[in-house]
Each structure stands twice: as C-alpha cells, then as structure tokens.
Amino acid sequence: MSLIQREQYLDFLRRHKDQDVIKVVSGVRRCGKSTLFELFKQELLDSGVKPNQIISINFEDLEYEALQEYHALHKYIVERLIPDASVYVFLDEVQHVPQFEKVVGSLFIKPNVDIYITGSNAYFMSSDIATLLTGRYVQIEMLPLSFKEFHSAYSQQNLSDMEIYNLYIEHSSFPRLVRVEDDESIDEYLESILNTVVLKDIVTRLKITDVPLLLDIIKYLLANIGSLINPTKIANTLTSYGRKTDNKTVEKYLQGLKDGLLIYEVNRFDVKGKALLQRNAKYYVVDSAFRKFLLSRTDSDRGHILENIVYLELVRRGYHVYVGHQQNGEIDFVAKKPHRLEYYQVSYTVMEDATLRRELSPLEQLDDNYPKYLLTMDVLHKTDNHNGIEQKNVLDWLLE
C-alpha cells in the first residue's frame, strides 16, 4: 500500500526548507515521523538534490549506535559536508543522543547546512535546550492520522463516512495499522507502543518502580476521558480500590504520561475573567483505540470518544485548547490562536430537544461575537444556525 501523504507536516518542512532555522518535529512514537522524513527526502531527490547532499541518521537503528556520543556524531556529519553545496541533515529520534543540542548548534552556524530533527517525547526539547536554541528553531507536533488522512486510505472502498469513522476509533489512527483488519494484530501493535512509551521512556526516565500503578492511572484516565479530574481525585479513587497511592505520586506519573505525548491535559479557562484555573482538568489520549485495548470497551461513551477526536483535530489545526468555565455551564472547548477565538460544544446527537437546549445553553451565555459551533453526528441537510451558533455534522467538519 502506498504511503499516506501527511500534507500538513510535509508543508511545514517545505515552507522552512533552506531557511536559517532548525526544523523540529515532535510526536508520540510510531506516529509517522520517520516516514515523514522519507517522504520529504524523496521530494528533495526529485527536485534535483543529489544523494550525497543528504545525511540521514535514525538513532533507533543499531547501525548508528556509536554516533549516540555527540563528539562522534559531530565528526561523522562534518566529514560528509560538501563545500559550496547545500547539505540536508536528518536526525531521527535525536533524544537518544545526550547533549545533541551541541551538535545541532555547531552545525547551525556552518554555511549551507539545513537541519531537521525528530523526537518522541516532550522533554527532548527541555527548557535548557530550548533556551540554547532560542530563535534558531521552529517546531511542530506530529499526531497519528487525522480522520481526513485515515479516510483517504479508504477512498477506493465502498464505505460510508460513518463506517470509516468506526474503523478509525476502533482500529487505531496509527499509520501502520491502516487497513489492518484483525484485532489480534492491532492489539499487538498497540501493546508494543505502550511498552515502548511506558516502559522504555517513562519508567526509565522517572525511575518508576511501581509499573502496575502507572498502568492503573492510564486506565483511570481512559475510563474518564473528557471528565474534570485532578491528581487527588485519582489517588483517592485508586486507594479506595485497594491501590494505595497519593496525589504527589499521581502528579509525577501524570507528568510522565504527558511528556511521553500519550496523554494530553486540557486546563480550564475562565471565559469571563480571561484567566486559567488551576484546579481540575480534562484528559485526552493520543489514540482512542487504546481505550478499547486496555479497557475492552467499544460502544460505551461514544460521546467522550468523539470529544477526544475533536480535541486532537483542534490541536492539529494549530489551536491552543482549553475547557471553557462559566458560572452556569461549561464549554467543551475554547480554541485560541493569536487574534482568533472559537467556541465548540461536542455532542454525539442532539435529536432530543432537551439535549439540544443543554448543549446550546453555555454558548448562548457568551456575550462576544467570536464563532460558536455545535458539532454532532446528526445528519444535516444544511448547516443549522441557532441564533448565531452554527451546528455542523462533525464528520463533515473533520473532513474540511
């Protein structure tokens, strides 16, 4: 099967090609970063770049283990630079190289060197490294396949949008699993990702000794997607089930899951006071198939699964996303960009009038003129407008 073109991320690399900035792509393991590099390198070759103008190293490959020492890596690359010719340097999973920023910083000041790096966690671009490279890099976070990208893989099959959506949430959005049908293969792959992210990355980095507790916290978060919770509530619930822990431990493990880009924390935003609220947050998962895999749940709570999908799509579209807090209601998502603000309510269906009124109420309380949307699975013959609130079919919105 041909590779799915990840246009959003390819366009990011194209726009910054040959510009005097380091291109950084972060994202959870197996989301497609290495494939993105392969696609982009092929574009370079097709445009006339010669093979010896491309230096590409994947630090997951044992062949390059000796280059995980930063002096050796620097020497290897410098020896392959070509006088008076552009050289494109791709460093994949660069977090395996302690002090890689010294190599990148040194290469950056050399003429005609265009640098691209990837990493599979949030801390590989720690505050110290980010400070060292301030003003010298641009970064994009890569996610597994969007519904639109996933949908494109099934364009030749006679499937409805709804049938493809069901495959999307149950069979995973990780690129390798597209068109994989048997549950056993899907489960094995998801387990391998969890083992890598949880055991190889989080447990090792945080020196966690109670791995079962970490897995229990993951399961709790997956069972409570889209619910307002906090570390104390998680600790108390697990303790009541006989899994004794405390909020400090939960906070530490939560931070590890966020750094591993497996779980996303969405804080509350006081819509009237225009301030972030510290207590309680919602949590979403990078791929909803983990919920089915770890909890053996399929059709239950489809509303919160849909909410999870919408959250990730807003992140893909470049928004900073918050939960909107009001005195008399909650807005699922406040999506912010510079000089731009949008409000979103997400509901699987609002066919019952009481449900429609409940979902519209928080948006109706807003006294500004920013766009307001209600996203549902309901089939609409046109975009419904409820006194300035646009109701859209969520699958149509995801395919925009």
What are the language-model segments listed below?
Residues S56-A85:
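Short glycine-rich substrate-engagement loop in P-loop NTPases that contacts/grips substrate
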Residues D183-L341:
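Accessory nucleic acid-recognition modules appended to NTPase machines
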Residues S120-A122, S127-L228, L261-Y264:
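Interdomain motor-coupling "hinge/lid" segment immediately C-terminal to the ATP-binding subdomain
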Residues K33:
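Conserved lysine of the Walker
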Residues V379-E400:
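Domain-level recognition of nuclease-like catalytic cores that cleave nucleotide substrates
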Residues I4-D18:
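Pre-Walker A adenine-sensing motif
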Residues V25:
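Hydrophobic anchor at the beta1->P-loop junction of P-loop NTPases
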Residues L36, F40:
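Hydrophobic positions on the alpha1 helix immediately C-terminal to the Walker A/P-loop
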